[in-house]
Amino acid sequence: VSGGGTEQGPGGVEPANDAEPGVVASSGRGRRRLLIVAVAALAVILLVAGVAVVRQLTEPEPPPVAASPTPTVSPTPTPTPTPTPTGHAPDDRSYDLADLPTVDVFAVIPALPVDDAPEEGTTGEVARPVPAGAPVFAEPGAAPVAALPHELPYEGSIVPIIEREEHWVRVLLVGRAGVPSAGVAGQLTGWLRATDVDISVLDTSIEVSVSAGTIDIVRGGERERVPGEFAWGTEATPTPIGRTFVMSVRTASSLAYTRGHPIVYLAVQSPTLDGFGGIDVAITAFHYHDVHAGPISNGCLRVGADAIARLTQVPPGTAVRITP
């Protein structure tokens, strides 16, 4: 239809871009150039990445660092302790007892020690030499200084043990180490070899308390009070204090003051008298006397008739402990 209408494009549809044809061509070429550059850059990136991957796959890993070995500590062996000896070594030597002084009530043997712990008790045992007798030692391992026979005229061969070892026993003895005038007093002691003695239990002992005025016989832990009061030594002639033992029990008819009662002789002697009654011993004892109270004697323990009757029943070797 002709007339005054607007011209349309082909198909009657208005074009979307009304730019000039030359400008459109130039824009297309720029896009292609950018695409080529991008592809080239991508190729370079892939090439570099591939090289890195190949290198990572082909290069050997560094060897692992070896861990420092932990030093082996060898344990120090614990030394085996040396056994502590339980006593003195045995002595198997033979000795001629005939060459040694005899331990008896009259003996004075300076080589033997006096009791250094008179306030102590005993083991509750007694020792008696075998029939051949026993050498007596001041110290185990030294040469013997005396001999203790199996039997003695005035007894005293059954002795209480105050210390016991496997091979040795320490005992109380009759006799003296010296005399009071020379400054020596106290209960005599010595060591015996265990192989030279027979050992037995004696569970009886006598305990005297001067201050309490009591005499007890102790047997198996049970105490029996000896009846009556008793007398003891004066200040000048005191009763010996400490441990000793019953040497013998016998009657002395020549001593009228005993009225015929037996005397219980003790091993310990006076701490102040060298002798008594014209002889060179100053033995102490339990004995009867009509007057038996207070500090009036020469060291003996004077008792009444009932008391001496009971005391004479204890066997030789019975331990006696006298306290102030």
What kind of region is each of these model predictions?
Residues P149-T195:
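SH3/SH3-like beta-barrel superfamily modules
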